């Protein structure tokens, strides 16, 4: 389980949840590869993740056009309400890759209900 801003990422169940103003959580539906891109970036928060690294991690042993990474990052940003020009979650590193810049925490398993 990973927490960042108003979001809770549950890799085990492949779910993304957003906490609203009332404290209630709403599930955000993501396609499997979109979830995989988000999960990889969150898992490696704070460091540069290259395009090649994302391709190898999310599409192992598969030939995928390089633009696929960009399309899925756009989908992740849309789900998070992030903007590339003024990012709070995903920073684009031109010609290199992406960096997840929001603080991420992993709560104690016993404290998660």
Q: Where are the predicted features?
A:
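Cytosolic linker/terminal segments flanking nucleotidyl-cyclase catalytic modules
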Residues: 1-113
């Amino acid at each position: 389980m990973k927490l960042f801003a108003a979001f809770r990422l549950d890799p085990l169940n492949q779910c993304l949840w957003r906490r609203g103003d009332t404290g209630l959580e709403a599930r955000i539906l993501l396609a499997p590869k979109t979830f995989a891109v988000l999960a990889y970036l969150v898992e490696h928060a704070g460091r540069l993740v290259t395009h090649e690294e994302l391709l190898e991690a999310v599409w192992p042993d598969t030939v995928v056009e390089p633009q696929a990474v960009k399309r899925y990052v756009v989908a992740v940003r849309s789900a998070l309400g992030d903007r590339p020009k003024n990012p709070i979650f995903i920073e684009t590193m031109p010609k290199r890759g992406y960096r997840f810049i929001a603080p991420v925490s992993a709560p104690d398993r016993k404290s998660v209900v």
